[in-house]
């Protein structure tokens, strides 16, 4: 069982204490590797089990099956607690649509299957053929975070984005899909946002051709769309359970964009800044749960970069045409560190322990890292 009272102290041995002392010599945040474990599978997703010191790995061993593993963080090591294998490889997962009491995980695999998992029994409670081909990305809302009903959104190579209610399994409750005769674009990333009340919820989706689309689930129509010129590897709102504030879009060609989503100009749309990062593909951005203005980006060169956003004195100005336009602040690179020669495919902050995170690289490793001094930012 995944109970918070069973958690072990994160740092108990002398070597870990010495490590903490070594990085305390400056006030600058440091990225410290706490645990590094080689695996016999390629890891596509890493997720902390809510309110525990356990995490889930999703991936595929050499025989191309799907593997779900549960690890326990115990002092200076991680221990495999349970695993289950399925015929097809897993690609993505989320706890976003579950309650803290149930802690059920939604997963997507390489053949388009969406499943909800009871991790205590390692059994599926829901299995749906959600897409015709691989589910690249998934997110959840209405469970741990966000007002309203629990929902899961999936994006696929078939060009479709589907929103699912786990209580209604026969069909999606909302969809974005290519029109007849329209080119099918590969959806690489999805994220919920603006879920601050039962009358407000959005889904953002990024595609391989640079399209970013935001669907208003309450109104049932497109809220906004743009193109960022490069394939969109990741999209994430700084918080999914507040009025939409900032949206980070990570792309190929070593760049990400940060949009201010509070003010939309009728001609220019939402204002944004463009930032170079990693000297490689920027796979994802993950905002710190304890501070929404701090976020980590993951690189195709095996690196992590820690950023902080600072707001401008005024977030909007009035243009000569009378319309308001958003004003961007600045981003600051706080720290960076290289861990591998292969991409960092997944990264997840721990909600309960500030600075603790788990990450998976395509070199068949999982790492637990600690970012220090975040409380001083």
Regions found by a protein language model. Give the residues of each.
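Leucine-biased recognition of intrinsically disordered, low-complexity hydrophobic segments
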Residues: 10, 17-19
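WD40 beta-propeller repeat fold
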Residues: 21-215, 223-242, 246-259, 271-290, ...
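Acidic Ser/Thr/Pro-rich low-complexity disordered segments
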Residues: 313-328
């Amino acid at each position: 069982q995944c109970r918070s009272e069973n958690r072990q102290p994160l740092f108990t041995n002398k070597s870990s204490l010495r490590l903490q002392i070594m990085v305390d010599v400056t006030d600058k945040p440091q990225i410290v590797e706490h645990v590094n474990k080689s695996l016999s599978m390629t890891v596509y997703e890493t997720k902390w089990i809510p309110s525990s010191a356990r995490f889930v790995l999703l991936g595929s061993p050499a025989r191309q099956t799907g593997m779900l593993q549960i690890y326990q963080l115990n002092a200076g090591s991680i221990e495999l607690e349970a695993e289950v294998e399925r015929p097809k490889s897993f690609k993505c997962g989320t706890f976003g649509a579950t309650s803290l009491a149930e802690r059920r995980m939604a997963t997507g695999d390489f053949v388009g299957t969406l499943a909800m998992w009871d991790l205590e029994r390692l059994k599926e409670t829901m299995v749906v053929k959600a897409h015709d081909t691989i589910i690249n990305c998934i997110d959840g809302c209405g469970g741990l975070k966000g007002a309203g009903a629990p929902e899961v959104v999936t994006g696929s190579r078939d060009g479709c984005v589907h929103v699912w209610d786990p209580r209604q399994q026969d069909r999606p409750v909302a969809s974005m899909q290519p029109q007849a005769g329209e080119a099918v674009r590969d959806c690489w990333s999805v994220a919920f946002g603006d879920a601050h009340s039962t009358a407000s919820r959005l889904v953002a989706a990024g595609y391989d051709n640079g399209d970013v689309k935001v669907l208003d689930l309450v109104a049932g129509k497109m809220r906004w769309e743009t193109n960022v010129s490069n394939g969109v590897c990741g999209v994430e709102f700084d918080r999914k359970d507040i009025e939409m504030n900032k949206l980070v879009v990570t792309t190929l060609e070593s760049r990400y964009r940060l949009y201010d989503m509070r003010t939309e100009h009728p001609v220019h749309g939402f204002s944004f800044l463009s930032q170079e990062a990693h000297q490689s593909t920027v796979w994802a951005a993950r905002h710190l749960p304890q501070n929404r203005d701090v976020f980590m980006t993951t690189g195709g060169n095996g690196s992590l970069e820690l950023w902080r956003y600072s707001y401008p004195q005024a977030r909007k100005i009035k243009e000569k045409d009378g319309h308001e336009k958003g004003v961007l602040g600045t981003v600051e690179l706080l720290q960076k560190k290289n861990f591998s020669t292969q991409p960092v495919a997944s990264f997840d902050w721990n909600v309960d322990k500030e600075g603790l995170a788990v990450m998976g690289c395509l070199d068949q490793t999982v790492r637990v890292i600690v970012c220090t001094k975040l409380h001083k930012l």
